[in-house]
Amino acid sequence: MPECWDGEHDIETPYGLLHVVIRGSPKGNRPAILTYHDVGLNHKLCFNTFFNFEDMQEITKHFVVCHVDAPGQQVGASQFPQGYQFPSMEQLAAMLPSVVQHFGFKYVIGIGVGAGAYVLAKFALIFPDLVEGLVLVNIDPNGKGWIDWAATKLSGLTSTLPDTVLSHLFSQEELVNNTELVQSYRQQIGNVVNQANLQLFWNMYNSRRDLDINRPGTVPNAKTLRCPVMLVVGDNAPAEDGVVECNSKLDPTTTTFLKMADSGGLPQVTQPGKLTEAFKYFLQGMGYIAYLKDRRLSGGAVPSASMTRLARSRTASLTSASSVDGSRPQACTHSESSEGLGQVNHTMEVSC
């Protein structure tokens, strides 16, 4: 890979072109951070607030960042021709190795939201050697049943597409209050994203199958995500039940579950500081970023109490200093005990 690919790229894949935006340049053998947005959004609408947050920029200067836009969802995308077959969720996942290979990434740390979280989870199931870790926000591992499908169809007949998508993105409380954030996203979804292309993506997401994952030991030959995973959901978010179920199907020794208070349906937008702090400790658990510096204190690394608990519950790293030379860390997978509590419960509710 050249020293810097900073900017926009259209990558050929077996299922069509993918629009990709690269920020930064490769840092030794460290993985790339690869993002995938939710349906109704693109990488800008989904991730700009999070990645522009000052503390997050302190993290990303240690990594190259690769933002992936689902086909036809980027700003200024041309409308697909009549009869175009939008890729299935499995095919969207199968497009990503072309991106990884094009830029010469050895492996990635994925950050996905909603539909993007589903795509990245499917990617990690099919190509586990390419994925170092996953942050999955608002993931629903379940396919749509007939009742859900009928409800979605009915909603599409009685609501505009942006309003239908908003009910997927935001909590009922946020929608009822018609918050400034909801109003802003209603306008941007209607004006920035090509509506015909969005309809195709929306239809395909609502035709998805179950992820087909099970916690190891619960069924014979159980399939699950092999990499460290951080699950994130806001309180009262539409995806809350799905994320809870996903947590029950993953390996508890390599999974952290963050339920974030006061964050609604888009925690990466409403609470970028909390999510950034959690992401720092997630990276530390995998052996990246040797120390954290709290900019508010001259003394340096003094994390909040809730994040200290999170760090204890994360998979312990044997080689956190390896981030200095960029070599791939090897994390042990035992869980630690908290004082007087016995086995740590990996479900961690952040309410700071």
UniProtKB/Swiss-Prot annotation:
Tissue occurrence: Expressed predominantly in brain and heart (at protein level). In the brain, detected in astrocytes. Isoform 1 and isoform 2 are only expressed in brain. Isoform 3 is expressed in both heart and brain. Up-regulated in glioblastoma multiforme cells.
Residue stretches of biased makeup (Low complexity): 314-323
GO biological process entries: cardiac muscle cell proliferation; cell differentiation; cell migration involved in heart development; embryonic heart tube development; heart looping; negative regulation of platelet-derived growth factor receptor signaling pathway; negative regulation of smooth muscle cell migration; negative regulation of smooth muscle cell proliferation
UniProt keyword annotation of Cytoplasm present: yes
Pfam families linked: Ndr
Cellular component GO terms, alphabetical: basolateral plasma membrane; cell projection membrane; cytoplasm; cytosol; endoplasmic reticulum membrane; plasma membrane
Stretch list, region Disordered: 314-352
Modified residues (Phosphoserine): 298, 317, 323
Alphabetical list of SUPFAM superfamilies matching this protein: alpha/beta-Hydrolases (SSF53474)
InterPro entries: AB_hydrolase_fold, NDRG
The record's account of how the chain is modified after translation: Phosphorylated in an aortic smooth muscle cell line, following PDGF treatment.
Domain of life per record: Eukaryota
Entry keyword set: Cytoplasm, Phosphoprotein
Subcellular location: Cytoplasm, Cytosol
Composition skew (Polar residues), residue ranges: 330-352
UniProt cross-references to PANTHER family, sorted A to Z: N-MYC DOWNSTREAM REGULATED (PTHR11034)
Function: Contributes to the maintenance of intracerebral BDNF levels within the normal range, which is necessary for the preservation of spatial learning and the resistance to neuronal cell death caused by ischemic stress. May enhance growth factor-induced ERK1 and ERK2 phosphorylation, including that induced by PDGF and FGF. May attenuate NGF-promoted ELK1 phosphorylation in a microtubule-dependent manner.
Family: Belongs to the NDRG family.
Protein name: Protein NDRG4
